[in-house]
UniProtKB/Swiss-Prot annotation:
Belongs to the UPF0246 family. GO terms for cellular component: cytosol. InterPro entries: YaaA. Pfam families: H2O2_YaaD. It comes from Lactobacillus delbrueckii subsp. bulgaricus (strain ATCC BAA-365 / Lb-18). It comes from the Bacteria. This is UPF0246 protein LBUL_1917. One of its GO terms (biological process) is response to hydroperoxide.
Amino acid sequence: MKIVISPAKKMQTDGGFLPKSQPVFLDQAEELWSYLHSLDQAGLEKVWRANAKITEEARQMLAADLTQPQLPALFAYSGLQYQYLAADVLDQAGLDYLDQHLRVLSGLYGSLRPFDGIVPYRLEMKSPLPAFKYKSLYEFWGEKVYQELYQDDSVVLNLASKEYSHLLTPFLKEGDRLLEVVFQEEKNGKWRTQATHAKMARGRLVRWLAEGGRDLSDLQGFTDFGYAFAPDQSGEDRVVFRKKA
């Protein structure tokens, strides 16, 4: 089983862990890095969908050398999901579990193992790509990420957003399973996904799996934050957890 999660916009460069490996798709990442280097201020503003001030700040990231990474992917992202995953306080068995099972989907790097070394960057899957030979990052990556994830596993637990899981969904073949995990809360008589709470729950679920060395058969036992497995809403390729607001 593989577990996929989205990256985070917020990144850091300080941490107590060192990279153990280089990204599988480092060559492709360097091609995208070179493309970003080729753009002027106006072009970068389009790609990053940012104003001049934010673009100038983000442009400083491009000085980094992708072959000289600063942190492992698992510790470089610092968004809400990663805060609740809290990998920095997992024991070695938990880290080994993540190294084997977890993958971070990325616009720049495609797919990342937890201890692949990366640098801070800004590039989302839906970023426009002016003056590039590919119309989109989806076209650029094609089947590459799908093939890498499914070459040894037929089951992927999907905790990524639709923006990132679309790296996989168009290419699924017979026998492949992409098991979507959904967190819902009741509000005013309706069940909805609350984005902030869902990010927290995704991070905690990954941690819960790693702490116990758990697999798919254990998934229904997750109850953190008051969530409970909802069998009537779940199916072969969808696991739903619900809680009362």
